């Protein structure tokens, strides 16, 4: 599963990555099945690699976040503003919000489908099983979940978590942790 959330096999859940930079790959070509078969012939172990919470490539405006899953993308506190991660073009990876129950269920279904489809792989490598960084996720959903978990009301959102501005409202070069950051 690529950083775009597209997969290299025919899936009933995730979109198929049938082309990249002009190179087309037919839907009936199962790249992983080929690697498993040929790798086993050579006596190799074969692992599948899945980028779990990655949902798009910001340099190409491509991926599930750019298709029908825009609501699942992380909201970042970027340079003093709440910004959808797809709008931060200096960040190539468009991450989804790991705390969103819809995102979690979708990813679990992709992983279960993969495990059913390829039981003969020797293992799985999971990448991007995380938030994009300390500046993500600042969505209303994450705020609500944080308040419930911590048992607090965040009065000055986002500054009580993280601040880009000094006490005079001037933008800092780097963020500073707020009173609720842990």
PLM segments and residue spans:
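Arginine residue identity/basic-tract feature
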Residues: 25-27, 45, 62, 112, ...
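Aromatic-lined substrate-binding rim segments of carbohydrate-active enzymes
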Residues: 3-54, 181-182
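The substrate-binding groove and active-site-proximal loops of carbohydrate-active enzymes
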Residues: 13-29, 89-108, 174-182
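Aromatic- and acidic-residue-enriched segments that line the glycan-binding/catalytic groove
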Residues: 6-20, 54-90, 129-173
């Amino acid at each position: 599963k690529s950083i775009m959330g597209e997969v290299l096999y025919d899936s009933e859940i995730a979109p198929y990555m049938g082309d990249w930079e002009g190179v087309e790959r037919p839907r009936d070509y199962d790249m992983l099945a080929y690697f498993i078969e040929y790798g086993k012939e050579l006596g190799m172990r074969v692992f599948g690699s899945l980028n779990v919470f990655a949902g798009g490539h910001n340099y190409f405006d491509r991926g599930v976040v750019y298709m029908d899953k825009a609501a699942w993308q992380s909201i970042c506190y970027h340079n003093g503003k709440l910004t959808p991660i797809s709008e931060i073009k200096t960040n190539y990876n468009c991450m989804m919000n790991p705390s969103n129950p819809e995102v979690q269920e979708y990813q679990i279904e992709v992983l279960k489908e993969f495990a059913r489809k390829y039981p003969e792989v020797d293992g799985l490598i999971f990448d991007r099983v995380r938030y994009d960084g300390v500046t993500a996720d600042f969505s209303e959903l994450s705020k609500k979940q944080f308040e419930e978990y911590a048992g607090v009301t965040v009065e000055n959102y986002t500054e009580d978590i993280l601040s880009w501005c000094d006490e005079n409202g001037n933008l800092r070069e780097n963020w500073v942790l707020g009173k609720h950051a842990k």
